């Protein structure tokens, strides 16, 4: 019967508990977008973050390294087919701890972020009519305002079965158009955030109207949409533990770097997923004056001219 020291029994118990709980994982992701001027596609995008966790059964399926494919791949490393393979603790005889082998880790990294689309179009936001009810010219001044919502939303594309406990933080700043917003969400969650802003607060006007005249003040703005594509890539690190039914070069237990096993077995080396962030915003508010002039009187129809009959 195998005997273990109290130290090894304690560590073995820790690995057993670990296997029953959620995998160890750490690391969050941050995306920062800062535009330098009103040309929004001339923006600096900073993205960073990494999340690492012991590989789960679901992630093994995503990478195609379940027992069958893994045994086949390991058999190509030295020529003998193993009876058992492992990628994490627990294992018989606590192989990873005793031999100081590395459990296979899923490493998820933010590796790419870019602007993929900007759309802008003019939009009439609000109107207001002013009248001069006096019988002499008069100056009319005013300010037309309207509250609107800037929005930021995210959607996940090609989402895979990664067991991630992390947050994704996104901050967007465009000082030239007065835009500053963001969000912090759990990995994989989709949502929409909005902030209310007031247009027209600095776009007052003054105009002279003739007696009985009127005008319409039109508050317009540019309604824009910016799309940002963020790429995340999952790779594997660590060692695959192998048990040969008969000794191989004098040993039953071996370990192979998981990257080597993936190479010789032609297995997936990485898995990608993407997050699409869409920012909706208003900018360049301005007021124009339309229909400036005296109110026209309605024309009255003259009665038909009577013709004298002989």
UniProtKB/Swiss-Prot annotation:
Localization of this protein: Secreted; Target cell membrane
GO cellular component: extracellular region; membrane; other organism cell membrane
Post-translational note: Contains 3 disulfide bonds.
Transmembrane intervals: none
Keyword Hydrolase: no
Main location: secreted
Gene Ontology MF term list: toxin activity
Keyword set, alphabetical order: Disulfide bond, Membrane, Secreted, Signal, Target cell membrane, Target membrane, Toxin
Record's signal peptide: 1-27
Tissue: Expressed by the venom apparatus.
Function, in words: May function as a large pore-forming protein.
Family listed: Belongs to the megalysin family.
Name of the protein in question: U-megalopygitoxin(8)-Mo15
């Amino acid at each position: 019967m195998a005997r273990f020291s109290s130290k090894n029994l304690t560590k073995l118990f820790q690995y057993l508990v670990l296997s029953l709980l959620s995998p160890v994982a750490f690391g969050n992701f941050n995306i920062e977008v800062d535009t330098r001027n009103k040309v929004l596609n001339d923006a600096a995008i900073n993205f960073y973050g990494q999340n690492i966790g012991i590989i789960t059964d679901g992630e093994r399926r995503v990478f195609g390294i379940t027992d069958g494919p893994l045994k086949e791949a390991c058999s190509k490393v030295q020529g003998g087919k193993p009876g058992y393979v492992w990628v994490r603790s627990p294992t018989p005889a606590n192989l990873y701890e005793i031999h100081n082998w590395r459990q296979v880790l899923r490493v998820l990294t933010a590796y790419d972020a870019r602007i993929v689309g900007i759309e802008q179009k003019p939009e009439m936001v609000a109107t207001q009519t002013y009248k001069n009810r006096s019988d002499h010219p008069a100056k009319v001044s005013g300010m037309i305002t309207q509250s609107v919502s800037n929005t930021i939303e995210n959607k996940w594309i090609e989402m895979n079965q990664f067991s991630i406990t992390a947050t994704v933080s996104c901050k967007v700043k465009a000082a030239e158009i007065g835009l500053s917003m963001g969000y912090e969400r759990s990995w994989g969650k989709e949502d929409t955030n909005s902030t209310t802003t007031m247009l027209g607060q600095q776009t007052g006007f003054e105009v002279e109207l003739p007696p009985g005249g009127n005008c319409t003040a039109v508050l317009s703005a540019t309604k824009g949409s910016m799309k940002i594509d963020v790429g995340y890539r999952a790779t594997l690190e660590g060692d695959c533990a192998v048990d040969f039914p008969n000794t191989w070069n004098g040993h039953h237990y071996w370990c192979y770097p998981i990257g080597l096993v993936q190479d010789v077995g032609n297995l997936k080396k990485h898995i990608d997923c993407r997050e699409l962030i869409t920012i909706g915003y208003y900018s360049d508010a301005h007021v124009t004056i339309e229909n400036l002039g005296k109110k026209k009187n309605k024309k009255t129809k003259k009665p038909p001219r009577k013709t004298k009959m002989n």
